[in-house]
Amino acid sequence: MLVATLLCALCCGLLAASAHAGYSEDRCSWRGSGLTQEPGSVGQLTLDCTEGAIEWLYPAGALRLTLGGPDPGTRPSIVCLRPERPFAGAQVFAERMTGNLELLLAEGPDLAGGRCMRWGPRERRALFLQATPHRDISRRVAAFRFELHEDQRAEMSPQAQGLGVDGACRPCSDAELLLAACTSDFVIHGTIHGVAHDTELQESVITVVVARVIRQTLPLFKEGSSEGQGRASIRTLLRCGVRPGPGSFLFMGWSRFGEAWLGCAPRFQEFSRVYSAALTTHLNPCEMALD
């Protein structure tokens, strides 16, 4: 009995050491192999950063990944995952306070370019990675990048977060347009030059001719100059069916993994009407210069 107990403790110690050895120096990323994991076991991982990467080679068993430290915080948070291709050998779920698991990433040819979801206040920010069974032993890698954001815009509709959340294709209401103009990572006035579709990533890339950068929190866009027109790329979901259209638009959205993702895109004239009406009734969330 004593020998069995010692062997069990030794195995647990080796698994913990193996998982620990897979951490990057800043403990923002982890790389490990299922070949060192006991069948049916659940490895425990904690990444203290708000962005990083996971690379799980030859997935086996399961991993439970806690993001951003052990304290869930008092504000809602948003996690976005972007899989590396080919993503194979595992599924990724988000743990919910109810005990349910919400599927975020799964292997297969229809895997979209990424997914975001929201955790509520005090909800533990944990992901559950489960290996999928395969009969052969060919090399499989389940790898993805993650970003964790504090959700300061809980009143925004789901499509404001971009990158594959439910409802991402419906138009924004007038109230959502006004709030997006005040809280988005970027607000630019421009026209659509073209739209390219990526069926593999299930994304559409909108090429925008930038007339004016009204606001941005990151240096994603540059205005046109005397040397030529400034152009920018904004991503959205392929299933939204974006097509080139005439006229000027106000593009608003978020930065995800260093890329611009579309939230709301009303015609500039339409937004001007909504904003003017809000100014008249003193219901505008913020002031902005449209001229």
Curated annotation (Swiss-Prot):
Location in the cell: Secreted
Tissue: Highly expressed in brain. Expressed in undifferentiated neural progenitors and in astrocyte lineage, particularly in Bergmann glia, a subtype of radial glia, and a few discrete neuronal populations residing in the superior colliculus, the ocular motor nucleus, the raphe and pontine nuclei, and in various thalamic nuclei. Weakly expressed in heart, kidney, skeletal muscle, spleen, testis, gut and lung.
Predominant location category: secreted
This protein's UniProt keywords: Developmental protein, Differentiation, Disulfide bond, Neurogenesis, Secreted, Signal
Any one of the GO BP annotations: axonogenesis
GO cellular component: extracellular space
Ranges in coiled-coil conformation: none
Presence of the UniProt keyword Disulfide bond in the record: yes
Domain of life: Eukaryota
InterPro entries recorded: Meteorin-like
Signal peptide coordinates: 1-21
Induction: By all-trans retinoic acid (ATRA).
Disulfide bonds: C28-C49, C80-C116, C169-C240, C172-C264, C182-C286
Additional remarks: Was called meteorin because it can transform glial cells into cells with an elongated trail.
Free-text function comment from the UniProt entry: Involved in both glial cell differentiation and axonal network formation during neurogenesis. Promotes astrocyte differentiation and transforms cerebellar astrocytes into radial glia. Also induces axonal extension in small and intermediate neurons of sensory ganglia by activating nearby satellite glia.
Subunit relationships: Monomer.
Family listed: Belongs to the meteorin family.
Official protein name in the record: Meteorin
The organism of origin for this protein: Mus musculus (Mouse)
Taxonomy of the source species: Eukaryota, Metazoa, Chordata, Craniata, Vertebrata
Chain's gene name: Metrn
